Amino acid sequence: VGMFDISDMGVLRLEGSNPKDALQRLLPSDLHRIGPGEACYSVLLNERGGIRDDLIVYDCGAIDAERGALVLVINAACADSDTAWIREQMEPAGLTVTDIKKDGVLLALQGPEAMGLLQELSGEDLSGLPRFGHRMLQLEGLSQPVFSARTGYTGEDGAELLLNADDGQKLWQRLLDRGVTPCGLGARDTLRLEAAMHLYGQDMNDKTNPFEAGL
């Protein structure tokens, strides 16, 4: 198992009436194919159909009878411009856009034994959690439940975890104590390249459309 600090990524939460219908105008993917607890990889488009960024969209289900919620994980280099673009497009449609990682951290556990380790830390059976599935988990010794998704950018199995800064430090140390290997950006880039995963700014940009990028 390797662990990555990916706190430079952006994480936004969209809330409002029919958030999928509103966000659908900016993405080529059919967001209605995913339901609560599921997610999909997609690309964020500009007004010409060029790719502004790639991202993962998580369906967090209904807040109440009239409102739903989505979580978006966007790339670090594009986070500010993505956030401004999404707000510009979503707020007139009545959605609120909140940066939910502002005071938190995002960690990735990756490798063939990563999910087994997460299962030990949570005390829950995660064997039924599919790729791109997500749920809240209470991990041993942490103060708050953790947004946990079976996603990653390495081509390996594993999970990405969103948690507050204090819990993030505790979890990082606990993982070190268990012998988990800390990994950096270079290792992550090599792994994603071996898995043929796109890198925004290198394999595609705002002048590339999804067809040209093979997406």
Protein language model regions, located:
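Basic, glycine/lysine-rich polyanion-binding surfaces/domains
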Residues: 1-215
